[in-house]
Amino acid sequence: MASWEAQEELRELLHHLPEDDPPADLTHLLELDEMEPKVLCGENPGDEKLKKQVIKTPPMHPSTVTWHFGYKQKEDQQDNIKMRDWVPDPSKMSKSTCKRLILLGLYQACKAQEIIKMDYDVHWEKSVVNEQYFEVEYNCKMCRTVLHEPMPIMYDPETELWVKPGRLRGPLGSAVYTLKKHYERCLLTLPSLKGTRLPKRRCNPSRRYETFREHPPTRKRRSKEGIPTDQQPSTSNGDPMALLSGPCGPHSIQPPSCLLQELPKPEVGSPEMAVAMSGGPFWEEVYGDSIFATPLGSSEDQLLSQFD
């Protein structure tokens, strides 16, 4: 006995209609293959949407997308815009690579390595004082404190490197020591939950650099040998003996005991030596003890004094 599904299939076959038969002439299908695509363009409402789905643009690098949609349009609208975290060539470097190049331009490799290991958020933005300069700041991730870099940085398009504007690192100072002390202090305390701390008010790095460049500081520099150029005594009490020539001078390898040779020495058997050996004038007056006098005291003390 056939099942219920088999009976339904048999019933559908019995109710076959004439229009369900395939057409005898199939020449119109060959004409569809010979038609050009331009003929159908515009007739189908979803033709343009279908083309956009089929033709896909290649994916862009994230840094390129950020630069194009974040800075390219702003640069076209405003020429003197203050750019933040600007990447000169996104096709060759990312923000992380640009940050490392900036730190290598500001400091030596060992100092830049210390800053990267301390894991600060490094940001840079275009200066309003000079369009070529970029001001660098360091944001602490633990307490959100903003620390400023005293030296501005600039990008050289010819060499494609980040370089310092000039050689004024000494007068301007360094931020490595401040970053290290702040990082060590934050490790010992809990992060601040009261809100963002405002950055310390200080002079603009670009304006400060321009001031030092126009008016260089006139400070006395120490010579390479370690002797001041003005030949003033370098001792704490102002005694110029350390700068004199001789065995006790700064360039001598003899011990300081040579100074004792210049002091007066008491002669053996003199009253000064007797007073010094007996314990001083107070000891001699009170106890009558002296190396030239007869020892005082009991017989027991005299007996013990023979074995001294």
Curated annotation (Swiss-Prot):
InterPro entries: Foamy_BEL. Residues 229-238 have a biased composition (Polar residues). The keyword DNA-binding applies. GO terms for biological process: positive regulation of DNA-templated transcription; viral process. Its main location: host cell. Residues 207-217 have a biased composition (Basic and acidic residues). GO terms for molecular function: DNA binding. Keywords: Activator, DNA-binding, Host nucleus, Transcription, Transcription regulation. Residues 228-304 are annotated as: Transactivation domain. A motif (Nuclear localization signal) lies at residues 217-226. Residues 94-203 bind DNA. Pfam families: Foamy_BEL. Transmembrane segments: none annotated. Residues 200-242 are annotated as: Disordered. GO terms for cellular component: host cell nucleus. It is found in: Host nucleus. Transcriptional transactivator that activates the viral internal promoter (IP), thereby enhancing its own expression. This transactivation is repressed by nuclear factor I. Also transactivates the long terminal repeat (LTR) promoter, thereby inducing structural gene expression, initiating the late phase of infection. It is therefore a key regulator of viral gene expression. It directly binds to and activates DNA target sites of viral promoters and those of distinct cellular genes. Required for viral replication. Homodimer or homomultimer. Forms complexes with the host nuclear factors NFIA, NFIB, NFIC or NFIX. This is Protein Bel-1. It comes from Simian foamy virus type 1 (SFVmac). The lineage of its organism: Viruses, Riboviria, Pararnavirae, Artverviricota, Revtraviricetes.
